[in-house]
C-alpha cells in the first residue's frame, strides 16, 4: 500500500513538474523585467523627458481614441493643431534625410564645401542637417547652421524664467512648499497623473514639471516617479509620518523622493482654485461708454471685396483699423490704399512681412503692429485681430458693450486640460527657424523651467495694458525677454506666446477662457497636412462655412461669441449674405431659420500686370491673350486687327454667381477707352452607358491642377492647364456599393497616357486622382474616360494649352509645345489602346499633326491657340469701361453698354463693399 502511494506521488510529480517549471520561469522573467523597468535611466533631454502616461481614466481607452483628435470638444482645440505621427514607423521621410550611418560622425557626413560654407560648430542633429541640405539659398543655410550651433551650445534659450503671477494667496502660492507624506493607492491615485518616471527625478524637477503642465500639486514617490494633480489638497486621513517618504532621489541622494506607495506632496505655486475669470454676459442694466477697439487685420490673397465687406460691417469713427497685407500680395495692398487715403482711422502697415502659415513672422507682425498702434494711434481699449476670412456674428454695438462691461479682461482660448498633449502636438519641444519662406525643424530642445505653459487659438481680444506690456520695449522684463527668445524659434508661436505671457505675469488673473470666436473645425477634412510645402510639420486648418453649417452659426445667438471663421465668397458668398442679413435684421436674428437671400455675384481679381506679386504662368498668359482675341472676334468690333498677340490685357477677374463659377472677365485697352468681356468655359462632361447603373452615380468629373483636400474642390476655377501642369481628376459620387473604376487618360494624338484603377467606397463621396506623367504634356484637347468593368461610366474633355514665344522664348516654346520625348509612364498600354479602338494609323497621323502644331510660331501659333480656346470657351458679352473721353468708347465698334450698369461686370456698383462715408 505504501509502495503504491510512492508510485502515485512520483507519477504526479512527473506529470506536473513541467508546468511548475514553466511557472517558475515566468515568475523569474517578470521579476527581472520589473527590475529593469524601474532602474532604466531616462534622458533629461528632448521631447521624451516627461512624455509618460495618461490619466488613469484614459488608460482604458483604445489607442485610436487616445491618439485621435476628432472626438474632442471644440473648447479643447487649438486653432491650428498639429497631427504629429507619434508612431516612429509613420514618421515622414523628411525627418530621416539628415540621418547618418551608425558610428559615423554626422557633421563629417556632410560635404560643406558643396553647400558653400563651413559651420561655426560641429552639427550632429539630423533634423538640422536635413534642413541645411534642403535649403536653397546660402543665406538661409548659414542662418540654420548658426541657430543650430547656438542651440547646441545652450545659448539660444534661457534655462529658467521668472514667474510673477500673484493670483494665488497665502502659503499655497509658495512653489516647493511641502504638504507632507501621504498614503498612495495603485487603484486610486492620490494625484491623478504620472508625469514622469526618470532618474533625473527630484524636488525641483517634479515641481517644475507639474508647474509647466498647469497642476497645483506635485508628488514624489518611489524615488523615480513624479505625479501631478489638481483640485483640493490631499485629505488628512491619508497622511503618513514623514519618515515613510525617505527614499533617496536618483538625481541627489541627499534629498528624499517619497517611498513605496508613500507620496511626498508639494505645492507648485499655482492656485488650486481656478483663476480664470468669468465674463459678464449678457450685458444688462447700466452700460458704460462703448469700448474703443483697434482692429488688427492680417490679410492675404486677392479677396479685396471680402476685406472691404468686413470693414464695412465693423466700421465706426471711434475705432482704428490697422491692416497688415502680406508682403507677397501687391494687388491687395494697392487696392486698400484708397481706403487709407479716404478714411483717417484706416492705416496700412508699411513694414510688411511674408506671414507664412506657422511662421515666427506672424508673431513678429502682431507685436510690431501693437507697438505702432500704441505709439501712433493710442486711443483704444482693446485689440482684436482678424483675417480676411473672419466675419462678425453680432452687430458691432454688442461687441462694444461686451468689452466695456468686461474692461481689463483678456480673452484667449486655451487648448483644454491636457497641456502635455498640446506641447507634443504643437512641437513646443523642438527648435524651428523661419527663412526662405519656410519653417525648418532643427531638432529637440529643453523648455525653460519656472513657467506655466499654455496655448490655444491665436485669435485673441487683448486689453491695451497687456498689449503695452508685451509690445513696448521699455516695458519688457526678464520674463518677456525670455519668452520672445523662446517663441522666436517656435512653430505657430502666436498660439502660445500670449497665453503663456498671461499665465506667468501680473495679468494672470485677467484671463477669460474665450476668444469670442466660432471656428468651423471639420478635422477629417481639415487635417490633410496641406501646409507641408512651407513647414516641417503636419497641421490642421478650419473649414469654410457653407449653408449646411448654418446650425452652428445659429447656436451662437445667446453666447458671447462675436466672430466666426472661415468665410470665403469663392466657396460660398451665400453664407456671408445670410450672416449679414441675420445680424442686421432683428426679425431674422429672432428666427432660428437661415435668412432667405437672393443669388448674387462675386468678383475676385485673378491677374493684373502691375502686381508685384504677379505669378501668372506662361500658359495662363497665353490663355488671357487668346480670350481677348476671342472676344474681339465675337463682338461687333469694327477696328482693324490688333497687333500680334492681341491687345494689352489690363486685368482678369473671376466671376461667380449663386456660388457657382461662371467664367472670366478680361479687360483690355487704355485708361481712356477700355473694354471688359465675359467668357465662360464650356461643359465637356458626358455620361456613359445609360444602361449602366454606375453611370448615374457619377455626379461630377473635372480636371484641374490645384486641389484643396480640406474643401474638396479645385481652386484653379478656370482650370487652365499647360504642358508643365500636374493635372488631376476631381470626381464626385452618389450613394452606392463599393466598386473599382478605371481612369484612362488620352492625349490629343490618341495616345493613352495612363490607365489607373481607383477605388470608390460605398456612400456619397468626393475624391481626387492625380496621375504622375512625364512632362511636357502634349498640347491640345485631352480626354479622360471612366470605366467600370470596361463599360463607359462617364468622360470629360479638357484643354492643355501651348505657350507662345513671347512668354518663354521661341526655342523654349517649340520644345515645350512638342509634347513628351517618350511615353508618359513606364507601362505598356497597348491593350488599352486596342480596347479603345485606336488604330496605329490613326495615332500615327494624329501624332504627325501634333508634331507639326508644336512647331508653329507667330500668327500660325496664335490661330492654333485661338481654335483651341474657342472649342472650350464661349463669349458671353462685353461692356465699356468709361474713361476720360467717353467718345473714345466707340472707337472699336458699336456702342457697348457701360460696365458700371452691366450686372456681370467687375466694375458694376456693389453696396456691400462701400466702407465709411461715400466719397465726394
Named regions from a protein language model:
Residues 486-677, 916:
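C-terminal catalytic/acceptor-binding lobe
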Residues 313, 317-350:
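Acidic donor-binding segment of Leloir-type glycosyltransferases
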Residues 339-381:
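Active-site-proximal specificity loops/subdomain of glycosyltransferases
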Residues 678-788, 792-920:
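Contiguous segments within soluble domain cores/interaction surfaces
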Residues 103-281:
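Peripheral, non-catalytic regulatory segments
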Residues 234-236, 371-422, 790-793:
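GT-A fold catalytic core of metal-dependent nucleotide-sugar glycosyltransferases
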Residues 407, 415, 419-552:
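Catalytic core and acceptor-binding pocket of nucleotide-sugar-dependent glycosyltransferases
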Residues 2-61:
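N-terminal signal-anchor transmembrane helix specifying type II single-pass membrane topology
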Amino acid at each position: 500500500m505504501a509502495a503504491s502511494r510512492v508510485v502515485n506521488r512520483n507519477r504526479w510529480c512527473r506529470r506536473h513538474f513541467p508546468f511548475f517549471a514553466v511557472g517558475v520561469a515566468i515568475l523569474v522573467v517578470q521579476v527581472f523585467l520589473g527590475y529593469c523597468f524601474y532602474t532604466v535611466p531616462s534622458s533629461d533631454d528632448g521631447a521624451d523627458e516627461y512624455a509618460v502616461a495618461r490619466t488613469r481614466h484614459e488608460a482604458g481607452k483604445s489607442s485610436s481614441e487616445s491618439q485621435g483628435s476628432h472626438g474632442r470638444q471644440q473648447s479643447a482645440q487649438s486653432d491650428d493643431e498639429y497631427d504629429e505621427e507619434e508612431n516612429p514607423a509613420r514618421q515622414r521621410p523628411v525627418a530621416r534625410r539628415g540621418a547618418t550611418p551608425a558610428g559615423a560622425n554626422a557633421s563629417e557626413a556632410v560635404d560643406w564645401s558643396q553647400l558653400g560654407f563651413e559651420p561655426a560648430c560641429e552639427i550632429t542633429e539630423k533634423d538640422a542637417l536635413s534642413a541645411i541640405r534642403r535649403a536653397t539659398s546660402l543665406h538661409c543655410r548659414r542662418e540654420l547652421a548658426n541657430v543650430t550651433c547656438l542651440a547646441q551650445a545652450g545659448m539660444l534659450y534661457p534655462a529658467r524664467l521668472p514667474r510673477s503671477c500673484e493670483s494665488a494667496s497665502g502659503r499655497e502660492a509658495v512653489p516647493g512648499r511641502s504638504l507632507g507624506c501621504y498614503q498612495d493607492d495603485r487603484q486610486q491615485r492620490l494625484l491623478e497623473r504620472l508625469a514622469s518616471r526618470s532618474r533625473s527625478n527630484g524636488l525641483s524637477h517634479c515641481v517644475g514639471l507639474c508647474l509647466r503642465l498647469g497642476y497645483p500639486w506635485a508628488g514624489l514617490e518611489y524615488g523615480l516617479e513624479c505625479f501631478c494633480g489638481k483640485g483640493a489638497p490631499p485629505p488628512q486621513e491619508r497622511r503618513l509620518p514623514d519618515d515613510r517618504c525617505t527614499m533617496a532621489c536618483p538625481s541627489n541622494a541627499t534629498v528624499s523622493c517619497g517611498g513605496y506607495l508613500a507620496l511626498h506632496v508639494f505645492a507648485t505655486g499655482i492656485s488650486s482654485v481656478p483663476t480664470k475669470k468669468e465674463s459678464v454676459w449678457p450685458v444688462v442694466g447700466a452700460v458704460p461708454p462703448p469700448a474703443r477697439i483697434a482692429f488688427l487685420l492680417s490679410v492675404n490673397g486677392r479677396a479685396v471685396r471680402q476685406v472691404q465687406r468686413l470693414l464695412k460691417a465693423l466700421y465706426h469713427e471711434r475705432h482704428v483699423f490697422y491692416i497688415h497685407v502680406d508682403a507677397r500680395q501687391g494687388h491687395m495692398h494697392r487696392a486698400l490704399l484708397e481706403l487709407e487715403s479716404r478714411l483717417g482711422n484706416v492705416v496700412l502697415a508699411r513694414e510688411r512681412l511674408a506671414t507664412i502659415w506657422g511662421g515666427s513672422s506672424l508673431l513678429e507682425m502682431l507685436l510690431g503692429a501693437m507697438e505702432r498702434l500704441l505709439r501712433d494711434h493710442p486711443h483704444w481699449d482693446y485689440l482684436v485681430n482678424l483675417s480676411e476670412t473672419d466675419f462678425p456674428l453680432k452687430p458691432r454695438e454688442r461687441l462694444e458693450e461686451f468689452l466695456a462691461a468686461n474692461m481689463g479682461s483678456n480673452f484667449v482660448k486655451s487648448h483644454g486640460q491636457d497641456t502635455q498633449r498640446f506641447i507634443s502636438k504643437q512641437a513646443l519641444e523642438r527648435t524651428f527657424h523661419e527663412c526662405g519662406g519656410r519653417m525648418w525643424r532643427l531638432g529637440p530642445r529643453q523648455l525653460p523651467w519656472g513657467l506655466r505653459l499654455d496655448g490655444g487659438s491665436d485669435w485673441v481680444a487683448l486689453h491695451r495694458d497687456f498689449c503695452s506690456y508685451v509690445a513696448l520695449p521699455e516695458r519688457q522684463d526678464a520674463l518677456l525677454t525670455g519668452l520672445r527668445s523662446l517663441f522666436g524659434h517656435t512653430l505657430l508661436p502666436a498660439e502660445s506666446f500670449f497665453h503663456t505671457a498671461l499665465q506667468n505675469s501680473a495679468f494672470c488673473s485677467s484671463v477669460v477662457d474665450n476668444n469670442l470666436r466660432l471656428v468651423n473645425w471639420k478635422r477629417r477634412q481639415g487635417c490633410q497636412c496641406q501646409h507641408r510645402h512651407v513647414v516641417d510639420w503636419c497641421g490642421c486648418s478650419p473649414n469654410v462655412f457653407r449653408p449646411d453649417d448654418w446650425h452652428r452659426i445659429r447656436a451662437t445667438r445667446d453666447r458671447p461669441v462675436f466672430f466666426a471663421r472661415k468665410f470665403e465668397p469663392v466657396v460660398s458668398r451665400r453664407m456671408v449674405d445670410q450672416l449679414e442679413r441675420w445680424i442686421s435684421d432683428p426679425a431674422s436674428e429672432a428666427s432660428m431659420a437661415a435668412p432667405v437671400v437672393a443669388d448674387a455675384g462675386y468678383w475676385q481679381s485673378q491677374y493684373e500686370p502691375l502686381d508685384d506679386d504677379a505669378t501668372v504662368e506662361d500658359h495662363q498668359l497665353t490663355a488671357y491673350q487668346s480670350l481677348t482675341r476671342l472676344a474681339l472676334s465675337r463682338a461687333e468690333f469694327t477696328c482693324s486687327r490688333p497687333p500680334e498677340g492681341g491687345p494689352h490685357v489690363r486685368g482678369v477677374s473671376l466671376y461667380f454667381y449663386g456660388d457657382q463659377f461662371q467664367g472670366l472677365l478680361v479687360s483690355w485697352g487704355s485708361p481712356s477707352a477700355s473694354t471688359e468681356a465675359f467668357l465662360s468655359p464650356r461643359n465637356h462632361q458626358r455620361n456613359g452607358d445609360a444602361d449602366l447603373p454606375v453611370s448615374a452615380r457619377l455626379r461630377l468629373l473635372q480636371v484641374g491642377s490645384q486641389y484643396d483636400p480640406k474643401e474638396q474642390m479645385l481652386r484653379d476655377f478656370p482650370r487652365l492647364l499647360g504642358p508643365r501642369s500636374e493635372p488631376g481628376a476631381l470626381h464626385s459620387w452618389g450613394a452606392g456599393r463599393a466598386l473599382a473604376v478605371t481612369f484612362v487618360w488620352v492625349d490629343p494624338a490618341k495616345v493613352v497616357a495612363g490607365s489607373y484603377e481607383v477605388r470608390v467606397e460605398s456612400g456619397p463621396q468626393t475624391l481626387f486622382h492625380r496621375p504622375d506623367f512625364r512632362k511636357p504634356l502634349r498640347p491640345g484637347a485631352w480626354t479622360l474616360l471612366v470605366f467600370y468593368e470596361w463599360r463607359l461610366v462617364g468622360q470629360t474633355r479638357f484643354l492643355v494649352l501651348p505657350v507662345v514665344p513671347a512668354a518663354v522664348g521661341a526655342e523654349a516654346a517649340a520644345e515645350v509645345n512638342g509634347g513628351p520625348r517618350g511615353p508618359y509612364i513606364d507601362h505598356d498600354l497597348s491593350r488599352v489602346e486596342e480596347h479603345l479602338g485606336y488604330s496605329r494609323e490613326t495615332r500615327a497621323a494624329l501624332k504627325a499633326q501634333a508634331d507639326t502644331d508644336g512647331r508653329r510660331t507667330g500668327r500660325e501659333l496664335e490661330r492654333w491657340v485661338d481654335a483651341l480656346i474657342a472649342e472650350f470657351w464661349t463669349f458671353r458679352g462685353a461692356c465699356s469701361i468709361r474713361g476720360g473721353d467717353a467718345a473714345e468708347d466707340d472707337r472699336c465698334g458699336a456702342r457697348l453698354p457701360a460696365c458700371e450698369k452691366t450686372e456681370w461686370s467687375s466694375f458694376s456698383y456693389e453696396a456691400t463693399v462701400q466702407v465709411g462715408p461715400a466719397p465726394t
